[in-house]
Amino acid sequence: MNDVTVVTSVTYPSSESLALVADVQYHEPYLSAALNRKFRGIVDPGFYAGFLPKPGGGMNLLITSVDGDKTAGAASVDIGEFYQVTIQQRKDISLALSAGKKYAIVLKGRYLLGEDTYQVNTASHIHAAEFVARTYTDSYQLGDGELLVCTVNIPASVSAITQEMIDTSERINRSIGIDISDSVTSTRSDVAASSLAVKKAYDLAKSKYTAQDASTTQKGLVQLSSATNSDSETMAATPKAVKSIKD
């Protein structure tokens, strides 16, 4: 008995012609496009872990994702109108910079239907993801699929990059889910305070504050008085007392 192979063919529409497009379907013609559209509009672009810029010795900028027990970076970029691509950093990367310039260090992701990148074809000169060091100007804008890692402002007279030259204030850091902590002394910016932490902070502040009366030498609580014959220096006159004196 011979094996029989059944071949079926279907005709599919252009995805651009559809008013609604759902997740990966049976007989999906372009799987890469289907997967790369899955989280567009759900996962915001930005850095979720790693991609930390540091001095790399001399005029080198090191970008690493080794941070404590974390050894890989994760970032999300929007590409075109419909796609989202996740980029992982698995190894440290060093960029050689020059003195006397201000740089924008950019992470760039790429996806184009029908285009091979070096990630899947060694004959391609197009990178699926890469770091780019560009001259920074006040009118500088990010392009499609790009995220700003940091800016680096290097004076002309230096021979080594320092941490003070690296500015990450404009980069977009993201988090899916938030860790909750009971600590009232933590300096972390990626952890939310629990109800217990709020109560601890309130109780601590309350225990440290003791109300005191105001006087001519210190600020504090003031009690009002309508008396017109008082010698007190810790009480304040009411409008009634002032009126009585005036009358």
From Swiss-Prot:
UniProt GO cellular component terms: virus tail, fiber
UniProt xrefs under InterPro entries: Phage_lambda_Stf-r2, Phage_Tail_Fiber_Structural
Renumbered residue ranges of the record's region Disordered: 225-247
Main location: virion
Taxonomic superkingdom: Viruses
Subcellular location: Virion
Keyword field: Host-virus interaction, Viral attachment to host cell, Viral tail fiber protein, Viral tail protein, Virion, Virus entry into host cell
Record field: compositional bias (Polar residues): 225-235
One GO process term, biological-process aspect: virion attachment to host cell
PANTHER family the UniProt entry points to: PROPHAGE SIDE TAIL FIBER PROTEIN HOMOLOG STFQ-RELATED
Family: Belongs to the tail fiber family.
Name of the featured protein: Major tail fiber protein S
Organism: Escherichia phage P1 (Bacteriophage P1)
Organism taxonomic ancestry: Viruses, Duplodnaviria, Heunggongvirae, Uroviricota, Caudoviricetes
Gene (name only): S
